[in-house]
């Protein structure tokens, strides 16, 4: 606890008022134990300091003498300070202000600690009990100083008592610590004895460890040398058995394992070449080079022997070994290509010999039980009566060869499912390449045989049947073969060329027929007075249309769009052109225009009747319908002219058309007023025309039917009669209106309805008249 020294001997002046201070008495009391502990520490330090000083001073001086001297000096200093204080009492107000400030600082340090009000109240209550006379405490003289010192002593006495009670609480702990002191001393003694023994044993152990370390180093060195020797033997040497396996052992999994090891040793020898003396590496490399080369030769011989005798692959073990050989050789393309070339040559010669023997009928030679040969019960015989069967049998045989070779090569070069996908793709390419090279050897022979048949055949039906067979087998071959543009003798390309040859042959035959017909005199002489189509067109379509009808593709024989259009033009338009040329050149017959039109109509009608059921010719049907319409219109105009001339109205018809041609959409009588200026337009001529009309029209229908009797199509005849009669009646009606307008006493004898009845078109005319316009 902090105490206040307020020794002042001034009586007249009172200190200046100061702000209220909080006195943290309780907190100082609580911290008193800590202060005592600090005091104890200070005392220990002083004692240690004194002990050090005792070493320096002489041994005759005692500690009590030094302490007495020190406290005497402190007392003298205190007296001197008191004298100085008495002198300072007479100083100015500034010094009193400093004293007051010092007092305030002390009070603030003591009272500013935060404490509960109840604790402050209790502290001051206890302090009040100690204070007997407050006036004596605040006196500035000696009496006040003694009173304050007395109060201080009482407070300190209470604090000492309080601290003593607190120290009593630690007495059991101190007692226990005293008991532990003896045990600790015993333990320290045991520790010292054990430490001494350990130190003695440490030296002996140290010597033993040194000896063990030397032995371990020696052992490690020996193990290292042993490991190096074993590693060298494993990496750079083969045992006797492994050398025997490579040189004389059976080719199997063990053989390839040893061979792989041998190759690794050969590769690792490059390390030995980098040492100072490379002779050892060179010797090892030379030895293993010989072993590897001999092993490769054994693998090549085994592979060639196995591939030449495919019947030896009847076991899974043999096939697996062959796959391992091929996989090993695949890494050495020069050896692999040599093996494949030998195999391809052998198989190619075999299938060519078998093919020729089948064609030539020599079954004894083809049945010599060679590996992978295809046996047939009968030869393929070319028959002049049935070339389609010959080509069918030939293509069937080729297809069986293709399937057999594909399956054989796939079984030989196919890999197991355990292989990865990259190897699968790689071997698939090899299978396709080998199969194609073997089968391509047949391309020349097959092409020559089939082209020989195609070239010698002249029947369209036969050529088309051959085309269908070749086209069918092209699709079948495409499933097993790949087309290669680099190989000119690719079998699939050869078959496609045969398809083109058959297409060209069909087109060539048709062109030759048309050329022959065009230049044939007999074809021109077939034009006669019955106006019927010539026989050559019937024969022409009897050969061509059946094969077109058999076609199922979008274009004929899968021709391109342009070629298909040219072909259709050749079989439809070209005959029409030839027929028209025949009509124009046939002057001896002296066909009039009507007969020529009827001939053309009958010709087109025949073509339409032939091609109508064929869907592939639907575009040409529309084109022929347009031509028929044009010819029908021309014949209708001729028939109209015949009716007008029969009624002797041709001059009037020409005059009216010169003024303004008739139209169904518009008619005005006033437009034709200039006709009155013509001398022919008179009452006498109209009366004469009536007489002729009266005699001609009753039998005109029979005359028309008789003139169209040679037209083959009843529909065309009916349309021509109806249209020509309607046109005549329209002219008759309009001409009668003109007469009525400009000739007062003249008129045609019959009305338009009566004329329509005479011509047999009353009902159609009634419907047509409704759409006519008269102004």
UniProtKB/Swiss-Prot annotation:
* Signal peptide residue numbers: none
Topology term for the membrane: Peripheral membrane protein
Which Pfam families does this one have? COG6_C (PF20653), COG6_N (PF06419)
User: Cross-referenced InterPro entries, in alphabetical order?
Assistant: COG6 (IPR010490), COG6_C (IPR048369), COG6_N (IPR048368)
Q: Can you cite an annotated GO cellular component?
A: Golgi membrane
**Among the record's GO biological process terms, what is one?**
protein transport
Quote the subcellular location field of this record.
Golgi apparatus membrane
Residue ranges annotated as coiled coil are none
Keyword Nuclease recorded: no
Q: Supply the alphabetized keyword list.
A: Golgi apparatus, Membrane, Protein transport, Transport
Family affiliation: Belongs to the COG6 family.
Q: What does this protein do?
A: Acts as a component of the peripheral membrane COG complex that is involved in intra-Golgi protein trafficking. COG is located at the cis-Golgi, and regulates tethering of retrograde intra-Golgi vesicles and possibly a number of other membrane trafficking events.
| Record's protein name | Conserved oligomeric Golgi complex subunit 6
Could you tell me which species this protein originates from?
A: Debaryomyces hansenii (strain ATCC 36239 / CBS 767 / BCRC 21394 / JCM 1990 / NBRC 0083 / IGC 2968)
Q: Which gene encodes it?
A: COG6
